Amino acid sequence: RFVFNTCGTVVRHVQVDERYAAGTHASNVARVVLEEQAVAVGALDSVTYASIVREYFEPSVATEIAWRLGVQQAACYDVVSACAGPLVAIETLRGRAATDPHWKRGLVSTASLSEGFLGFDIQSIADLDELAAGLTIGNGATATLVGREPFARGGRIVGSYSEGYPGHHPLCRAPVFGVFRSAGSALFALAELVPDHVRRACARFGWAVEEVDVFVSHQPSDRILREVAQALGVPAARVPQLHSFYANTEASAVPIALRHLVDDGTIQPGMKLLLNSAAAGFTLARVGVVWEG
């Protein structure tokens, strides 16, 4: 109860049917998004899986997603950067767009399925610090389209910026044969790195922090987001806290937050959005977007 109250955890969505793995969930969501955006499967030049890879090492999960969708030919690869995966994948696709004139559009998919990889046997204070974060993890799957031309619904990417702080690598880990463990208090303390990274990202995009209308963020804890808003000197309302709706859905958190804020009317055409994530490793990632509706 202490952990839930501290983070603001109310609901955790979990997968209970073991027949449906990451590739299945990711492709199911992708079909919905492709239909909404009126994009044919054959029009995809790339398929990227941007979640934590948990089920197998080869081939790439992206190839499974593409196969389930019926893609016949496209670049397929995984971008694994823990919770920051989708934003790092978008940055990777921006690089591809800059170097490959034939690339037109790509799919970025996530499927955050953590059941079976979390440990809840808390017997000591040390266990509480290392395992408590797992209590707030929820499951989810998302699909995002990135392309040179506008889609029926979306925004224009103005920049991306990711940076690693590998000195903090030991703080969080999910071994192949084991459960997720995180030095919770030390990892959460790294939130102090976020405001400066946000300022540098905005400067790269030609924005002032005060110009950002909505900070669409990873959702590890409502309290952390409130503290970041205070450190940046922006109203808490511009940093929506959605942890209570979905818990921490790892790599799926930012796309889920974006869809939620579009659907509930928070995000309107013309708004400047800063997509934000932090990940084990330690990695910070930002993508600037002007929403076009």
Where are these regions (language model features)?
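Flexible, glycine-rich active-site loops centered on histidine and acidic residues
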Residues: A98-T136
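Claisen-condensing/thiolase-fold acyl-transfer catalytic domains that form or cleave C-C bonds
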Residues: G23, S27-A30, V53-R54, W67, ...
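Phosphate/pyrophosphate-binding loops at sites that engage ATP/ADP/AMP, CoA/4′-phosphopantetheine
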Residues: V29-D45, D196-D213, L232, L261-T266
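A contiguous, well-structured pocket-lining segment that forms one wall/lid of small-molecule binding clefts
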Residues: V176-H243
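Active-site-adjacent elements of ketosynthase-type condensing enzymes
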Residues: R54-T63, T110-A126, Y161-F177, P220-E227, ...
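Short beta-strand segments
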Residues: V80, G106-S112, G138, V146, ...
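Condensing-enzyme catalytic core mediating Claisen C-C bond formation in acyl metabolism
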Residues: R1-R19, I122-E192, D196, A278, ...
